[in-house]
Amino acid sequence: MRYLTAGESHGPSLTAIIEGIPAGLTLHPADIDHELQRRQGGYGRGARMSIETDQVQISSGVRHGKTTGAPITLTVINKDHQKWLDVMAVGDIEETLKLKRRVKHPRPGHADLVGGIKYHFNDLRDALERSSARETTMRVAVGAVAKRILAELGVDMLHHILIFGGITITIPSKLSFRELQERALHSELSIVNPKQEEEIKTYIDKIKKEGDTIGGIIETIVQGVPAGLGSYVQWDKKLDAKLAQAVLSINAFKGVEFGVGFDMGFQKGSQVMDEITWTPTQGYGRQTNHLGGFEGGMTTGQLLVVKGVMKPIPTLYKPLMSVDIDSHEPYKATVERSDPTALPAAGVIMENVVATVLAKEILETFSSTTMSELQKAFSDYRAYVKQF
C-alpha cells in the first residue's frame, strides 16, 4: 500500500491516490466523510472550517460499494478557492495580480522562509500553500480507507488529549478501552474527563482574545493488533520507528513517545520492563504495558500506545517579528487565517495516520490480493500466536 497527496490550501481541490488496497473491501464515500467531519470539529476551530464542508469524491478503484484492487482516487473540493481565483491561477497573469496576497514576511515556526530559500520562491505563498495543514485533509481521507481495512480485521483505535496548552487532563482510573473511546468521542475537546471541559474552553477563549495559540500532547491507543507485526532484522523494518516517522510528518508535531515514553529516562529497568505472562485461554500477555505494546520494533499483542506532542500553531493574530525578504528590514510576520488551537483536529489526523501505517504493515505482512484472502490469513495468524 502506498499513497500520494496533492493540492494547495487555497487551490481548487485536494487529491490522494492510494495503491495496494485489496479487492472486495466495502467502501462508501460516507465512510471517509465521517472522518473528514471529525477533523473539522472540535472547540477552537476557526473561520476556514465554517467555509469548508469536506466531502470526498471517489473517481476510481471502487465500484458498487466495493474496492476493485485498482488505484483509488480521492478528491475533496476547496470551496474557499472561489475567493482566490487570481491568487491561485494556474496560467500566467498580470504582474499587478501576481502581487495580490504576495507573502514576503515569513512566519516564525512555519515553512515560509526555508521553503522559499530551498525552492527559489519570490512569493512565499508557494511554500505556504502546500505546507499548510489543509493537506492533512487527504491524510485523514487515506486513513479512513485504512480504518475500514482494520475494522474488518477486528482492530479498533481511539485518541484523546493528555495535555491541553499546559493543562494536564486527569484521567479517571480503570477506564476500559471502550469507555475511553466513548468519552473522547463525545467531547468537543477530545478529553476523557468532562469535569475539565469548561476550564479548558475558558482558557482557549482567553488565548484567542490574546491573539495567541496553544499546543499539547495527544495519545492514540490501538486495540486488536496481534504480536509480531514489524521486525528487528533491519532498522527500517521496526514498526514503532515507522509510526514515529509518520506521526512526526504531521504538521506541527515535534515529538513522539511510546508507552510511558520519556519517563523511562527517570526509572530503573525493573520498573519499566513488562513481565511476561501466559494463560491457556489468552496465550502470552504482559503484567503491564509500560513499553506501549512494542518490543524490538515489533508489536507484543498489548494495546499500542503512541503519544505525539503538537507545538502551538505558528500563525498568530498578534504576529511575531520577522524580516521583509525584499528589503531585509524588520517587519511583523504575515497573518493568515488561524485557530487558537487545533488539538482535537490533530488528534483525528494522528489517529488516521497511525491507522494508515498499521494497515500498510498488515498488507505487506499477509497475503492480501482480496479482503477474504487477507481476513483468512490474519485469522490464521491470530490462532497461531495464541497457541505458540
Swiss-Prot record:
Domain of life: Bacteria
Cofactor list: FMNH2
Entry EC number(s): 4.2.3.5
A Gene Ontology molecular function term of the record: FMN binding
Pfam families in the record: Chorismate_synt
SUPFAM superfamilies: Chorismate synthase, AroC
Known pathway: Metabolic intermediate biosynthesis; chorismate biosynthesis; chorismate from D-erythrose 4-phosphate and phosphoenolpyruvate: step 7/7
Assigned keywords, A-Z: Amino-acid biosynthesis, Aromatic amino acid biosynthesis, FAD, Flavoprotein, FMN, Lyase, NADP
Enzyme kind, highest EC tier: lyase
Catalytic reactions on record: 5-O-(1-carboxyvinyl)-3-phosphoshikimate = chorismate + phosphate
Cross-referenced PROSITE patterns: CHORISMATE_SYNTHASE_1, CHORISMATE_SYNTHASE_2, CHORISMATE_SYNTHASE_3
One Gene Ontology CC term in the entry: cytosol
Bound cofactor: record note: Reduced FMN (FMNH(2)).
BP terms from Gene Ontology: amino acid biosynthetic process; aromatic amino acid family biosynthetic process; chorismate biosynthetic process
Similarity section: Belongs to the chorismate synthase family.
UniProt function note: This reaction introduces a second double bond into the aromatic ring system.
NCBIfam families given in the database record: aroC, PRK05382.1
Protein name as annotated: Chorismate synthase
